[in-house]
Structures are given as C-alpha cells and as structure tokens.
Amino acid sequence: MLNSYDLIRRPVITEKSMAAMADRQYTFIVDIRADKTQIKKAVEKVFGVKVEEVRTARFDGKVKRVGVHVGKRSDYKKAMVKLTEDSKTIEFFEGM
C-alpha cells in the first residue's frame, strides 16, 4: 500500500482548477494505482480536511518526438476532490 504522502504527487494549478476552488473543489495529480478511497483518506490525513466526494480521470501520456527519436510521456491520473461544507480550506492553495 502506498504512503499518503507518496500517493498525492502534486496539485494541478490551472485557470479551470483555480475557479473550481470557489466550490471547495481541489485537483491533484495522484499515483496511477490509487483508488478513490485511498485518495480520500490521503487528502484527509495530509491536509486535515473532510472530503465529501472524489472524482478521478486517467490519462494516457502523449507520444513526443525529438528529431528521429520517438518517446512517450508517462500516463497519469487526476483526482478532483470536493470538500464538505463544514470543512476548512486547504492552506496550500491560499493566496494563489
């Protein structure tokens, strides 16, 4: 089983994800092997908040070319986490 701190890779900082923060919804890139219950427990443990809902999406890495060499970016999983109304906000995103 993955450690809670290893499961959450990084936050997604885009215009769309920042607009969703007004609705108490935060977006993270997570380990591709993680399921929704593991993601919920990890976010609650790491940030000390209450999670209401977790939605996930899995993406295939793009094929990229540099000259004659062809490579592929890594596959990744994105998790959209919605917090409960009585939960505090995640301090990491404050001031962005």
UniProtKB/Swiss-Prot annotation:
BP-aspect Gene Ontology terms: translation
Protein name: Large ribosomal subunit protein uL23
Function statement: One of the early assembly proteins it binds 23S rRNA. One of the proteins that surrounds the polypeptide exit tunnel on the outside of the ribosome. Forms the main docking site for trigger factor binding to the ribosome.
Pfam families reported for this sequence: Ribosomal_L23
Family of the protein in this entry: Belongs to the universal ribosomal protein uL23 family.
UniProtKB keywords: Ribonucleoprotein, Ribosomal protein, RNA-binding, rRNA-binding
Assembly information from the UniProt record: Part of the 50S ribosomal subunit. Contacts protein L29, and trigger factor when it is bound to the ribosome.
A GO cellular component entry from the record: ribosome
Domain of life: Bacteria
UniProt GO MF annotations: rRNA binding; structural constituent of ribosome
Native source species: Clostridium novyi (strain NT)
